[in-house]
Amino acid sequence: MSRLSPALLLLIACLGPAVFAQDIAGKIEGKSYVSPTGQFHVQIPVLPELGGDITDTPNVVTFQDDFNVYVSIAAFQQDATQRWENSTRGAKDYLVYFFSNFVLADFKQNFEGVQIESAKFVPGTMEGSLLTYLLVPGGTMFPERVSPLGGDAVPVAKRGNLLFVRNSFVYVISIELAERVIEGKAYGKSTEEQDEILRKRLLDMVDRITFTAPAAARK
C-alpha cells in the first residue's frame, strides 16, 4: 500500500524471497493470509523485507511494517441477536449501531479523547457500508517515528474504518494514516485530502479480499 522508490524495489528484488513468521492462528498461502475461520483470504499488504509483520487472533488480523502501513481486518460472526438487529434495523442503522456499541466503544476504552471526525453510509460499497474517520490522541501505531511536537503535546492519530456485513459476519477494516503523525507539522494535507487517501486505501484492501461462499452456495 505504501509507495516505494525504484531503488528500494530493486534492492528487495535482489534480496530474494523472504517469509513471515508462522506463529499465527490463520495461515499463509503464497502471498495471501487465510483467516482462522476460513471465511476470507487477503493479499498481504506488507513485505517482510520492510519489517512487515502479521499478528492475529481468531477474529482480527493486523498487518504492519516499519514505514507507514498499519491495517487491521476484523470479522465478527453474527449470533441470533445480531442477525435480528441487522434484519430489523436495516444496513445503515445496523452498521451505525455496531460501530457505536462495539468499535467506537473499544477505541474509547483504550484511548482517552477519541473523537468521530466524520461518518458516511456508502450504499454502493459491499451492498452498504459505513465509512468513519476517527481522531485518536496517543493512538498511533508508529510511536517511535512520531515527529516531535514540543511540550506535552500528544500526537493525534487518524484512523479510517470501513464496516460492512458479508455472509453473516461483520467486517471492520481499519487503517491508520501514518504520515499524519510521522511528518507532524510538515504534513500539509487538508481534512478532505486525508479522508480521500484513507478512503482509497480502505477500498484497496476490500479489493484484496476474497470471501468464502456460504456452504449452501458452494457447488
Task: Give the ranges of each region predicted by the language model.
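Boundary at the C-terminal end of the N-terminal hydrophobic targeting segment
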Residues: 19-23
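Secretory pathway targeting signatures of secreted, lumenal, and periplasmic proteins
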Residues: 38-120
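Surface-exposed amphipathic alpha-helical segments
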Residues: 48-50, 173-219
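Signature of long, low-cysteine stretches enriched in small and polar/charged residues
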Residues: 94-167
